[in-house]
Amino acid sequence: MNTMTLTPGQLSLSQLYDVWRHPVQLRLDANAIDGINASVACVNDIVAEGRTAYGINTGFGLLAQTRIADEDLQNLQRSLVLSHAAGVGDPLDDAMVRLIMVLKINSLARGFSGIRLSVIEALIALVNAGVYPLILAKGSVGASGDLAPLAHLSLTLLGEGKARWQGEWLPAQTALKKAGLEPVALAAKEGLALLNGTQASTAFALRGLFEAQELFASAVVCGALTTEAVLGSRRPFDARIHAARGQQGQIDVARLFRHLLTDTSAIAESHHHCHKVQDPYSLRCQPQVMGACLTQLRQTKEVLLAEANAVSDNPLVFADAGEVISGGNFHAEPVAMAADNLALAIAEIGALSERRIALMMDKHMSQLPPFLVKNGGVNSGFMIAQVTAAALASENKALAHPHSVDSLPTSANQEDHVSMAPAAGRRLWEMAANTRGIIAVEWLAACQGIDLREGLTSSPLLEQARQTLREQVAHYTQDRFFAPDIECATALLAQGALQRLVPDFM
């Protein structure tokens, strides 16, 4: 199990990916402790001096004008968690819950939240013990923070609700006991600090980004394979073309294609003197389209990495000035817009792949047997596999609708503009699954097309891609049950079988 020292505000994308993919043992950087303690001292001073400060000794939302008596402050924080745990939907998986918890710890440990070190350490203990709170997927509008999902997370700290430990759902009290942990009692401001923040929205979108990176790499490899299968030209990847335009994503994608295709291959030599002048756009414009997608991936990375390291609590404690200031860092609009842009990229990666599949089906365009199978008529070959890819591409067009332009006022119009970032991030998972299915069909089709070139081979890297598939899925000599082959190719893609052939591009 990986051990990670968490320096608040300095998580890298690779660290976040590791947290999502694997259980982790966290250690808090000791340099963070003074800032955490100073923010708590500031909150305690406000209470002791009888000053009124939102979230410390007031109600919440529209009830912010209601002053809470000192003797009720602890109960106020507990009541906040219980009442706000109002989510619906399916439970999030352990990987997503773990990522949300680490993001929450990272934010709280920045020292602007007025939450005791002991509570942060209790969250770290949950991560290290593998105790995963039951967080329901739906119920947040991404402002004021991800209240419902983070309340469900916080229930476990209180010994309420349910949690999963070693794969079993248990009452939270039982899960804590089995893991050797104890519930905590929250002090002033701590319930609000736990609930306010964009950590669920950010985690949802980060998963979308991680999957989009794999899809992008896989699609570039399959696009190169298809270029070979249909006797496409290498000329459109010439560096001079892309330098003349100056779009960095496009320049970098063309370089990836040159890396995969190399200068030539046996397939390329076989049609070196052909009379074709230009390839269809789905081949020729791959650097332009995929380059635009890469730019979106890179911009999304910047936004999400900043948000993963952000303080998105409210109010914020500025201990050096002895002030608590209300603001709006909980509003997840940056995450929502980043997720919307990422959705466009995921949809386009799949759409371009589907067009290349369709190209291979057409004997006039591909110079291959119709639907990539001999004895057509008796055999239907890839006919319906292409229809499946088209269906998935069409679904993604609807799913790519922007969420950040939607808003419904909540909390009696106190919270009158919201981001819808959780939904924006969560739909990326379905889009990624759809696009992975499309790319799986293209991988199958492109390898079949190269097989039909009667022993001609492609570049070394593309032959690796073909061999990886052929170790699991045989060449089609006649029709057979097709769905298991798509499932197998999809699983290989999810494992990064093609991603490892592509140099780092982020």
From Swiss-Prot:
A Gene Ontology biological process term:
L-histidine catabolic process to glutamate and formate
**Residue(s) of cross-link: 5-imidazolinone (Ala-Gly):** 143-145
Q: Which residues carry this modification: 2,3-didehydroalanine (Ser)?
A: 144
Record localization: Cytoplasm
Record InterPro entries? Aromatic_Lyase (IPR001106), Fumarase/histidase_N (IPR024083), HutH (IPR005921), L-Aspartase-like (IPR008948), Phe/His_NH3-lyase_AS (IPR022313)
Q: In which pathway does it act?
A: Amino-acid degradation; L-histidine degradation into L-glutamate; N-formimidoyl-L-glutamate from L-histidine: step 1/3
Pfam families for the chain = Lyase_aromatic
EC primary class = lyase
EC number(s) on file: 4.3.1.3
The UniProt catalytic activity note for this protein reads: L-histidine = trans-urocanate + NH4(+)
PTM comment, free text? Contains an active site 4-methylidene-imidazol-5-one (MIO), which is formed autocatalytically by cyclization and dehydration of residues Ala-Ser-Gly.
Quote the protein name from its UniProt record: Histidine ammonia-lyase
